[in-house]
Curated annotation (Swiss-Prot):
Protein name, UniProt field: ATP synthase protein 8
Originating species: Vicugna pacos
Name of encoding gene: MT-ATP8
GO MF, one annotated term: proton transmembrane transporter activity
Taxonomic path: Eukaryota, Metazoa, Chordata, Craniata, Vertebrata
Keyword match Transmembrane helix: yes
GO biological process entries: proton motive force-driven ATP synthesis
Membrane topology of the entry: Single-pass membrane protein
Positions carrying N6-acetyllysine: 54, 57
Compartments reported by the entry: Mitochondrion membrane
Length: 67
């Protein structure tokens, strides 16, 4: 049974790792980083539901008896 020649494995693995590293660096360098998102302020209009407009009343506080 012939022996497996492993003399070139080191160079093959090393070149593969270097290639992966370079490709990953190129991919990261072309990535666009967006600025930090900020909340968008917009006018919010509260819409009253029909039951809110129908039953909305302003109650005065109870009058205290005069002393």
């Amino acid at each position: 049974m012939p022996q497996l020649d492993t003399s070139t494995w080191f160079i093959t693995i090393l070149s593969m790792l270097m290639t992966l590293f370079i490709l990953f660096q190129l991919k990261l360098s072309k990535h666009i980083y967006y600025p930090t998102p900020e909340p968008k302020f917009s006018k919010t209009h509260k819409q009253n539901t029909p039951w809110e407009t129908k039953w909305k009343k302003i109650y005065l506080p109870l009058l205290l008896p005069q002393q």
